[in-house]
Amino acid sequence: MSQGVEFNRLMLEMRSMQMEAMAKAKPVQAPAEVGAPSFSEMLSQAVDKVNETQQASTAMANAFEVGQSGVDLTDVMIASQKASVSFQAMTQVRNKLVQAYQDIMQMPV
């Protein structure tokens, strides 16, 4: 007899938990952030940053080649490697975006 009462109590608890869970399952919308940059703006900023890095590296290399004082070979090499790494990273991001686009376009409708 006590097991039947225990079972009924457990069933009541489970039902109340189910009702609570269903009440909490309302879809929540994320608040729209004012002034948050769009994906295209962020991508454009990243490309601009890579471009600036490459231009700074080229300018530093040109300054070293003409013998401008204050330009050290190690600084030129570090700037060159930073530009190279940033360009390679941007290329990989582009490749991933192209692959994602192709995957989406090949999905059956």
Curated annotation (Swiss-Prot):
Q: Does the keyword Electron transport apply?
A: no
- Name its cellular compartments: Bacterial flagellum basal body
Question: Which is one GO molecular function term here?
Answer: cytoskeletal motor activity
What GO cellular component term, any one, is given?
Answer: bacterial-type flagellum basal body
Source domain of life: Bacteria
Principal location listed in the UniProt entry = other
Disulfide bond sites: none
Alphabetized UniProt keyword annotations: Bacterial flagellum
Which NCBIfam families does this one have?
fliE
**PANTHER family for the chain:** FLAGELLAR HOOK-BASAL BODY COMPLEX PROTEIN FLIE (PTHR34653:SF1), PTHR34653
Q: In its UniProt entry, what is this protein called? A: Flagellar hook-basal body complex protein FliE
Task: Report the source organism.
Answer: Pseudomonas aeruginosa (strain ATCC 15692 / DSM 22644 / CIP 104116 / JCM 14847 / LMG 12228 / 1C / PRS 101 / PAO1)
